[in-house]
A protein has these predicted regions:
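Periplasmic/ER-lumenal interhelical loops and adjacent helix-loop junctions
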Residues: 244-301
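Low-acidity, Ser/Thr- and Arg-rich intrinsically disordered low-complexity segments
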Residues: 2-11, 18
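Multi-pass membrane glycosyltransferase architecture that uses lipid-linked
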Residues: 16-252, 297-457
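N-terminal secretory/membrane targeting signals
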Residues: 1-2, 232
């Protein structure tokens, strides 16, 4: 050991053969994740121009059915339901009591837009959706995720105009904001945002548990109190006003849905159809298969889905962190849902795209993950809305399109899983160092290890 003045040992640089000493004056978040601090301002003007042009095309496709959507099924159908619910709410009716809602209570926030008319409500909804879209794009770029921002920019074109016509765009915004809050150690805000996402789509409740692995134990209480408090404040008033039975009926209806035609588990049912068996497709909360065969497949799907969630929780409880951060847990959970759920609506790919965009810049197979994500979006758009009628009317294209989509989903799941579990060394935590003992003053000596005198191989 040797002693040198504390004012000079930083300036002489690393000694031959020694490990680099981390700069203790730099915040841990900046040392560990320099890529996330690469951009102090928003995306350049050309990036915003590309974003705006793709959004203009998407909105025109949604509202006016321009090429190639002239004969495709309309993606705006749910917007009319939202407008009707908004009218009921503004008329003084109580959700879940006076009229039925098929979503959790978080949807009420978006029903609060003034329903001057159906057209005005749709314009308001799409405007808010575009704002959420822009905020996600800006947040991804500012956090140093350039590849993620590019992926998010092109995702609507690959998936189709349904991108802004469902509530999932707001779920994606809440998830991105929550992950960034965790990275910046704003755990209370992260809990509030994840609870908000849970109030629109139930599955983020599982993420609240998973991301505890990315939060220091001393901050768990603050995070969990914020999340549970938000859920209680949102649900208790509805229960007190008599909406409890309607809310429970809505949740039970979601749980008992059949196998949706876009699901991986729809493939054997399409095969049965092609073989001449009667397996009808019905329209309800979703477009799903019905009949005894579909019920058996749905039971298997539910079992596999539960096993997938248990697997995610097991990895969290055993400390097997994918990517060692909250974004990795989000992608792992989103992948499990897409792969194993009997309900796979196209809009689910909105928050899947957000999850990939958060991870892709630091993933071990980033480019490959981005490419397969785009392929998944395109394959999903082919099923809905482009070839929707071919899928539901029992034509010969149903089976090959379902098989193609299932193969892409499985391939995506494999790449995504390996991307968050095989993280390159440079993406991990920076090496730590025991603090040196300072004796007195700026020139007090500190003890540092001498370099290994043996030559470096």
């Amino acid at each position: 050991m040797a002693t040198i003045p504390s004012t000079s040992w930083r300036s002489i640089g690393p000694m031959p053969g020694s490990r680099p000493v981390p700069d203790r004056t730099t915040p841990v978040s900046e040392r560990d994740e320099p890529h996330r601090l690469a951009h102090r301002s928003g995306p350049p003007s050309l990036w915003w121009l590309g974003w705006a042009l793709l959004r203009l095309f998407g909105i025109l496709a949604l509202l006016h059915g321009i090429f190639p959507y002239e004969h495709a099924f309309s993606s705006s159908s749910d917007l009319y339901s939202y407008a009707q619910w908004s009218h009921d709410l503004w008329s003084g009716l109580l959700p879940y009591h006076d009229f039925a809602l098929v979503y959790p209570p978080g949807v009420i926030v978006f029903l609060g837009l003034p329903p001057v008319s159906t057209g005005v409500y749709i314009a308001e909804f799409l405007s808010v959706a575009l704002v959420a879209d822009a905020l996600i794009f800006r947040a991804l770029y500012r956090s140093g995720r350039s590849l993620g921002a590019v992926l998010w920019m092109i995702a609507p074109t690959a998936l189709g105009p349904i991108f802004w016509a469902r509530l999932d765009i707001f779920v994606a915004a809440a998830l991105v904001a929550a992950i960034l809050c965790i990275e910046r150690r704003r755990y209370a805000w992260a809990g509030i945002l994840l609870a908000g996402a849970t109030l629109v789509k139930l599955w983020p409740a599982v993420l609240i548990v998973l991301v505890l692995r990315a939060i220091p134990r001393r901050s768990w209480r603050r995070f969990l109190l914020a999340a549970t408090g938000t859920l209680v404040v949102a649900v208790l008033p509805l229960m007190a006003l008599g909406g409890g039975a309607g809310l429970w009926h809505s949740l039970r209806s979601q749980a008992t849905r059949g196998v949706e035609y876009e699901s991986v588990f729809a493939l054997p049912l399409y095969a049965l159809q092609t073989a001449g068996h009667f397996v009808p497709i019905v329209f309800g909360l979703s477009v799903n298969f019905a009949g005894p065969a579909a019920d058996h497949v749905a039971t298997v799907s539910d079992a596999v889905f539960v096993c997938a969630l248990v697997f995610c929780l097991w990895r969290a409880l055993t400390g097997r962190s994918p990517g060692a951060d909250a974004a990795g847990w989000l992608l792992l959970l989103a992948t499990a849902i897409v792969l194993t759920s009997k309900v796979l609506s196209p809009q689910y790919l909105v928050w899947v795209s957000a999850a990939v965009a958060l991870v892709v810049d630091r993933a071990s197979r980033g480019i490959r993950l981005a490419v397969v994500t785009v392929l998944l979006l395109v394959a999903t758009q082919v099923q809905f809305p482009l070839e929707f009628y071919q899928m539901v009317l029992g034509t010969d294209l149903g089976l090959p399109l379902s098989a193609l989509h299932a193969i892409v989903v499985v391939f995506f799941a494999a790449i995504a899983y390996r991307s968050v579990t095989l993280v390159p060394a440079e993406a991990g935590p920076a090496p730590t160092m025991r603090p040196a003992r300072e004796l007195e003053g700026d020139l007090a000596p500190v003890t540092v290890p001498m370099a290994d005198p043996r030559p470096v191989a």
